[in-house]
Amino acid sequence: MDFDDHDDGDEEMPPMPVSSSYETPPQHGLAGGGMAPKPPGEIGSRVKGPSCGGGRYRECLKNHAVGIGGHAVDGCGEFMAAGEEGTIDALRCAACNCHRNFHRKESESLAGEGSPFSPAAVVPYGATPHHQFSPYYRTPAGYLHHHQHHMAAAAAAAAAAAGGYPQRPLALPSTSHSGRDDGDDLSGMVGPMSAVGPLSGMSLGAGPSGSGSGKKRFRTKFTQEQKDKMLAFAERVGWRIQKHDEAAVQQFCDEVGVKRHVLKVWMHNNKHTLGKKLP
């Protein structure tokens, strides 16, 4: 009957599967018109999530030298999915084997026109700029060998940037006082930014311009009568203040109107000038 032939034709037509946008399209063309059997490992490899739409993923920004404090990229220029959409391999790049999140995402609005500002083009201050894309073909096992000199240059540039502006050492006063006490009125006040060291003691008696700073140091003024009395007292004690002369020194300072350390510094400064003139 014609009806039997019509029924046989309906039974031979394979059912058309309905696939969503998250699943791979069915494969046809096999014997019998059915779909290809799925391998056991593919059943659990599908993920539920949005597709790669909404923008393109450009160059890989993963730093492969972060462990040694450097910066080295693999040179991958654009993300290329390693598997079909909807699988776990779709999130892995077939070129650099990195996750899709390491690639710079370019939105659809900027896909037609180049982005005016790219985070990958930012070079740290003091670092040596390096080529973003490798001129050589990258092999899966040796892509880091070409960037070793970039890693060394980046590490050297980072060290130079950190130590390129060395801080000036703190100025410390000289430890050799040469007989001068602390708080000397004649020693002068030296600014914190001036070079203070073993030569700071040579500024005594050198005049107002002897100090390394621009500030004029304080100098005690003596009258001629005070100079004559201090000269006579210095000759009497031998140009040195000893312990058994403390009472006489204190009495002399009260009479003349000078401090003890001022008298001591004056004797030290004039011992080699006024003392040598004596017969």
From Swiss-Prot:
GO terms for biological process, alphabetical: regulation of DNA-templated transcription
NCBIfam families (UniProt xref): homeo_ZF_HD, ZF_HD_prot_N
Keyword presence, Cell wall biogenesis/degradation: no
GO cellular component: nucleus
Domain of life: Eukaryota
Pfam families: ZF-HD_dimer
Main function: Putative transcription factor.
Record's protein name: Zinc-finger homeodomain protein 1
Acidic residues bias locations: 1-13
Primary residence: nucleus
InterPro entries: Homeodomain-like_sf, Homeodomain_ZF_HD, ZF_HD_homeobox_Cys/His_dimer
Zinc finger (ZF-HD dimerization-type) stretch: 57-106
Sorted UniProt keywords: DNA-binding, Homeobox, Metal-binding, Nucleus, Transcription, Transcription regulation, Zinc, Zinc-finger
Assembly description: Homo- and heterodimer with other ZFHD proteins.
The keyword Cytoplasm appears for this protein: no
Localization in the cell: Nucleus
GO MF annotation list: DNA-binding transcription factor activity; transcription cis-regulatory region binding; zinc ion binding
Gene3D superfamilies reported in the protein's UniProt record: Homeodomain-like
DNA-binding region(s) in UniProt: 215-278
UniProt site positions, description: Required for DNA-binding: M267
Notes on the domains: The homeodomain differs form the typical one by having namely 4 instead of 3 extra amino acids inserted in the loop between helix 1 and helix 2.
Region (Disordered): 1-47, 168-190
Gene encoding the protein: ZHD1
